[in-house]
Design a protein with these regions (language model features):
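Short, surface-exposed, charged amphipathic helix/loop patches that serve as local interaction elements
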Residues: 1-95
Length: 95
């Protein structure tokens, strides 16, 4: 479940040109509880369809890739939407 970035980014001296989201398959209910808590603490709004938001996708991607969430803040908009859509599809269309 790799995503090739249209435009690579550099964060703290590390060049990132793709993201491997395969780790989503190993997430547990406990992992999701911590993601939902972090989402709320970071200002995520509402309790309905959090999984469809960019912030939720950034938190999930950070958790499964091991990259800090700040890396996901500097992705170009198109790559950010690509990550969001991939996370959404995992939870709603493949599950």
């Amino acid at each position: 479940m790799k995503i090739k970035l249209k435009e690579p980014v550099e964060y703290q001296g590390i060049r990132v040109d793709s993201l491997d989201l395969t780790g989503m398959e190993s997430l547990t209910g406990r992992d999701l509880n911590s993601v939902y808590d972090l989402y709320a603490n970071m200002g995520g709004s509402g309790i309905i369809m959090q999984e469809a938001t960019l912030l939720f996708a950034q938190i999930i991607a950070s958790k499964v890739t091991g990259f800090p969430i700040e890396l996901f803040y500097i992705l170009k908009a198109g790559d950010s939407v690509k990550v969001k859509n991939r996370v959404y599809r995992f939870f709603f269309l493949e599950g």
